[in-house]
Amino acid sequence: MNKNYNLSKIIFNDLISFYKTQLILIFMIFISALLIITIIHKTRLLTSQQEELDIIKKKQMPLNLEKYISTSRLKFKHEKIDT
């Protein structure tokens, strides 16, 4: 009278009956980690695309305008605001 038990089924039933909240929390942590990775990846792609557009715009910019922008940025960096 050997009775065969399906161990994986027993473990699964125990997990569902006794550890529901822990399983839900682990699942939510896993989902949030995947979402964070996806958001970071998309943000980096958008940043690199923006940098490429800036490079293209800079190449198309006339030299006089480029000098004006660089000198005006320097002026704003060194100005002090009195309060």
Swiss-Prot record:
Cytoplasmic-facing ranges: 1-20
UniProt KW keywords: Cell cycle, Cell division, Cell membrane, Membrane, Transmembrane, Transmembrane helix
Domain of life: Bacteria
Membrane topology: Single-pass type II membrane protein
InterPro entries xref list: Cell_div_FtsL
A GO-annotated cellular component: plasma membrane
Main location, first listed in the record: membrane
Signal peptide: none
Residue spans crossing the bilayer: 21-41
Ranges per topology, Extracellular: 42-83
Protein role: Essential cell division protein.
Family: Belongs to the FtsL family.
Protein name: Cell division protein FtsL
Organism: Buchnera aphidicola subsp. Baizongia pistaciae (strain Bp)
